[in-house]
Design a protein with these regions (language model features):
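Hydrophobic alpha-helical segments within soluble ligand-binding/sensing domains
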Residues: 107, 168-197, 243, 286-290, ...
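Extracytoplasmic "Venus flytrap"
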Residues: 55-57, 61-86, 95-112, 126-131, ...
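Hinge/cleft segment of the Venus flytrap/periplasmic-binding protein
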Residues: 11, 52-62, 201, 205, ...
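Bacterial lipoprotein signal-peptidase II cleavage site
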Residues: 22-35
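Flexible loop/hinge segments that line or gate small-molecule binding clefts
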Residues: 137-177, 287-295, 300
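Hydrophobic alpha-helical
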Residues: 126-142, 217, 231-293
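Short, solvent-exposed amphipathic alpha-helices that sit
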Residues: 75-90, 178-182, 208-228, 246, ...
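Periplasmic-binding protein-like
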Residues: 65-68, 118-128, 146-151, 200, ...
Length: 357
């Protein structure tokens, strides 16, 4: 979801999920079935945006504070575009309070400072540390601020989207559901091949979040296709270099691999050492590089996450809550579009961020 500076273990569990989907540079625009996306593909995340008069139905939210992973991160910028689109619709201003670089502690402090000194009525956050941010979110909610967690739920339980902080809203997904979709894609890539040898390039073995995703992948694969055989489970990480090495190790031990799954960054590296005519590749991420690879037939599929709509839906849901509505407090981002990003599925969409910067 990277540059080497991201490999700090501060906030490591959610960093792994961040890396599974994020690039480090600027992004391009995304077409979304669930939300209007801003049209300026080259614009970076703005410090603030001007707002139109509040339409009927929003009397409370005048300012939305956005806390992304870091300002120049292209995944953050893609989500911010959706936040800005939603804010424009409800007539609110957007304040981008993302840290300058990946820094979970600085991100939490920015939330706490805004709660104490700021004047935003709605927070949308991409938490770098889901456990630490849960505390900051509770403080904001206790102060009367509406808080929406985008992309990842807040708290230590990786199996549920249900809010682990009372009053919190969530627009996102769990690593468990992500792992299950990846396994289903692998099973579909296997088709009728018997046996079908599958290699899984997991993220970081030391991280609980990655372990939860891996466990979901393994159990779902076994149930989805009885002919699928997991012959390699190697740490692939979140860079092309680590993915290339993992693919080489997997192939050396198991030369007859038919399907290989890993982070989109790892699969970018793996594609340089596998024969795409023999090995079907699945990347966990919807980066521009992944889109290009699937469209060109180099990869079987990608994980099709709707980043722009995630930001948009966070603002719309938050505004409804802030104005006294009683909507469902959870939006599953896997329902914003079909997450199984085969070539036919992604044909009507455009990418929104880069894995390479």
């Amino acid at each position: 979801m990277k540059s080497s500076k991201l490999l700090s273990l501060a906030g490591a569990s959610v960093l792994a999920l961040t890396l599974a989907a994020c690039g480090s540079g600027g992004g391009s625009s995304e077409s979304s079935s669930a939300a209007p996306a801003p049209t300026d593909a080259s614009s970076s995340a703005a410090e603030s945006s001007s707002a139109a008069p509040a339409p009927a139905g929003n009397e409370v939210v005048k300012k939305v504070a956005f806390f992304g992973f870091w300002k120049t991160n292209s995944f953050t910028q893609a989500v911010l575009k959706g936040v800005e689109a939603g804010a424009a619709e409800i007539g609110a201003e957007v304040l981008d309070l993302s840290p300058a670089e990946y820094d979970a502690a600085a991100q939490i402090k920015a939330v706490q400072d805004q709660t104490i000194k700021g004047d935003a009525q709605l927070y949308v956050m991409l938490a770098s540390d889901s456990v630490g941010m849960a505390t900051a979110a509770k403080e904001a909610i206790d102060a009367g601020i509406t808080v929406v967690a985008a992309f990842t739920p807040l708290g230590a339980d990786f199996t549920t989207l249900e809010p682990q902080v009372p009053g919190l809203a969530v627009v996102g997904e769990t690593p468990v559901s992500n792992g299950a979709i990846l396994a289903e894609l692998a099973a579909e890539a296997c088709a009728d091949l018997n046996p079908c040898n599958v290699a899984y390039l997991e993220g970081f073995k030391a991280l609980p979040l990655d372990n939860a995703r891996t466990e979901a992948f393994v159990s779902t694969l076994a149930a989805a296709n009885p002919n699928a055989k997991l012959v390699a489970q190697v740490e692939g990480g979140y860079s092309p270099d680590s993915g290339k090495k993992a693919a080489q190790d997997a192939l050396q031990a198991n030369p007859d691999i038919n399907v290989m799954v890993g982070s989109s960054q790892a699969i970018l590296g793996a594609e340089t050492v596998v024969d795409p005519a023999k090995v079907k590749l699945v990347g966990n991420g919807a980066s521009c590089e992944a889109f290009e690879a699937v469209t060109a037939g180099k990869w079987y599929a990608l994980y099709n996450l709707d980043t722009v709509s995630m930001g948009y839906e966070s603002v719309i849901l938050g505004s409804e809550i802030a104005n006294g509505g009683t909507p469902a407090m959870v939006v599953n981002s896997q329902e914003l579009r079909d997450p199984k990003g085969t070539a036919d599925v992604i044909a009507s969409y455009e990418c929104a961020y880069s894995d390479l910067g």
